[in-house]
Structure formats: structure tokens, C-alpha cells
């Protein structure tokens, strides 16, 4: 009997020691294994939430379109209903952002960059529900926004949530898990794991603290996020444009010309985004009623636009393969391009919860295809395929605007599965980036972050000035 009791006690002691070792391992922030395990958790959660966000947005869009189909034969009902449904959905997103989490407005990527520098707060308990539900409203309304920015911000906030739940207190763990979540978010949005890694290294290079632990954590999170995405959505490329032909060496100079065009377009586009933001700020002046009504009007107009010209509304993923296939004339491509520039400015600059990656990719596709079709007419001896210029244009506008050419190249190649076009992509994106920099253009996300920080400092200074003298001493 004593022997059985002794054996039982020995087993209990061994179990307690193992639990204590695991607990101490998880509490030691400097332990790479603990951070890597947490990175795997962050990547898995980001993949699950990213897939759920995609499905939720699609569900809202299908419900809205289904309601319109029911009254398609009655024009006097169709047009008002299209406006009202999209307006109400958009107003939900604008209201939630303005009321509960202003940092959830817009793309969210500048907020993650600011958080990596410890300059912006990460209130995940507010941002996660607001960004998810608000994004369902604005994207479901058919507004010209993408889901990649929200997914990146959601991923970063999930990283901070995991950090808080497991009480990891070191600055290294806090920074690493935030970056891991952001990279996993981009991977989950585009099914582009390598682009997710490069996005953190390239776009967030001023903020990302590169070391062996942090980069391994980012790799781990992106792997888990991609696995989750592919379990639910399969392994097919997210944009189906088919296998395009190679670009002959004697045509590569045309891709440099295309890059020069985007090098001019990028800074102009960025400037228009910032000016439109200022215009909206002057209009609503921070008043929630004006802001929500303004958002409802923009959402309603996008709903109407979706009836008139479906290609001019929505994020643009459905438009890209249609445009790249050469189904539109050059004139129609340019018309849709201009229309989508206007709608992108209105939707994104108004502060709606939604990204600008997908709209920029669509804009690049439209202009690239138009250039390719024109070049095919001017140089028939080259037997050009307009789709190859569409692929190059997708990455070029992003390279010129965001100033992340490597991310743009890899992202487009992963999304379209046309890796044979890597050389023309490099030429186009490099030309666009160099000219945009030469013209004095600033990276879009960095500029938005700088404006946010300036506004934050001004608000803090005003609070300090208005505070009683006793509180400042």
C-alpha cells in the first residue's frame, strides 16, 4: 500500500514539475520558443479571422444583391433600394468607427506602423469588433475598398491580444507579435505568404526590428495563416488570369515606359488622396452626424454606381481578370480607370474602414491593359499580349504609391501565378519607384501616419493647454 502511495506521489511530483517548467518557459519573454509558439497562435487566429471576414463580407454583398434582384423588374423600387441598402450598410461602418474606435478607420496599416514605433495605441478590444463589423458594412455596401488593410490591422491587433492574454511583457515580444499578426493578415487576405513577409521587411522597414527571433516569428505566423487560408479556400491563385506568354527581350523597353507612366501617376494619386482627406475633414469637422451622413451618401452612390457600371464599384478583384483579358476597348478602360480613381478617393479618403491595396491593383490593371492594347496596335511586329502589361501595371502603381516595389512584384506574381513575368515586373516597378522618388513623391502610408501623429500631438497639446494649472504641475 505504501509502495502504491509513493508511486502515486512520485507521478504527481513529476507532473507538477513538467507543468512548472512549461509555465516558466511561457512566461520567459526572452525564450525564442515561447515567442515562436505565440507566433503560431497569432498566425492561426489571423488566418481564421481573415477567412471569416472574407466570408462575412461576401455574405453581406450577396444578401444586398439578392434583395436587388427581387425588385429588378421594378425600376421605381430598384434604384432607391440600391441607394438605401448601400447607404445603411456604409453608415453602420462609419458610425462604429467614429463612435468606438477612430483608429479603425481607413486602411489600418499606418496604425500598425505607428504601434510598432510605440507611437499609436493598440486597443484590440475595440478595434477587432469595430474593424470586422464596420468592414462588413462598408465593403458589403459595394464601396471601392479592399479587405487587405483591415485584415492586416486585425492581424496586428490579434498579435497584441495574444500578448496580453499570455501576459508576455517584454518589448521584444510585443513588437514581434504585432509584426507577425500584420504579416499573417496580408498573407490571409491575398493568399500570398512571401508577400506578407516582404511587406513587413520592406514597407515597415523603419519600424520593424529585424533579428533572428522576429523574422522566424513572422515566418511562423505567415505559414500558419496561409495553411488556414488554403484549408478553407484551396490553393488556386486568388486572381485567375490564366497563363500568360513570356515577354520577349526586345519588348522590355515598353515595360520601362509603362513604369515611367506609373512613376508619374503614383505621386499624383497620393497627393489626391491627401487632399481629399483634407476636404472631408473640412466638411464634417469631426462631427459624428455629418460624418455618418456623408459616409451614407458615398455608400449609396456606390450602390447606384454598381447598377450603372458594376466594374466601377467594389474592391476590384472581379474586375481585374475581365480587364486583363482585353474585354474592354482602350477608351472604356480609361473611362473606368478615371471613374475608379474618383470613387477610390471618395471611399478611402472619407475614413471608411477599408483598404486601398485592392483598388490600387485594379487601377494598375486598367491602365496597364490600356497601355498594352495601344502598344499592340502601334507595334504589331512584337505580337504583344495586353495581359502581360496588366500584370506589370498591377504592381507598378503600388510600387510608386506605397514605395514597396519588391512587395508589389511578389504579391502580384503570387496572386496571379505568372512567375515567368518576373523580369518585366521588376523593370516596370523599378522604373515607377525611381521616377516617383525623383519627382518628390512620399510613401502613402508613411505620410498618412505622419499626419495622424501630428493630429495626435496637436490634440494632446490642446488638452494640456486647457487643463487646470494644477494638473500640469
Curated annotation (Swiss-Prot):
CDD domains: EriC. It catalyses: 2 chloride(in) + H(+)(out) = 2 chloride(out) + H(+)(in). Pfam families: Voltage_CLC. Residues 1-32, 117-123, 167-176, 202-214, 282-287, 439-473 are cytoplasmic. One of its GO terms (molecular function) is voltage-gated chloride channel activity. It is found in: Cell inner membrane. A motif (Selectivity filter part_3) lies at residues 355-359. The keyword Oxidoreductase does not apply. Its main location: membrane. InterPro entries: Cl-channel_ClcA, Cl-channel_core, ClC. The record marks 148 as: Mediates proton transfer from the outer aqueous phase to the interior of the protein. SUPFAM superfamilies: Clc chloride channel (SSF81340). Residues 109-116, 177-189, 193-201, 387-401, 402-404, 405-416, 417-421 dip into the membrane without crossing it. It comes from the Bacteria. GO terms for cellular component: plasma membrane. Keywords: Antiport, Cell inner membrane, Cell membrane, Chloride, Ion transport, Membrane, Transmembrane, Transmembrane helix, Transport. Proton-coupled chloride transporter. Functions as antiport system and exchanges two chloride ions for 1 proton. Probably acts as an electrical shunt for an outwardly-directed proton pump that is linked to amino acid decarboxylation, as part of the extreme acid resistance (XAR) response. Belongs to the chloride channel (TC 2.A.49) family. ClcA subfamily. Homodimer. This is H(+)/Cl(-) exchange transporter ClcA. It comes from Salmonella paratyphi B (strain ATCC BAA-1250 / SPB7).
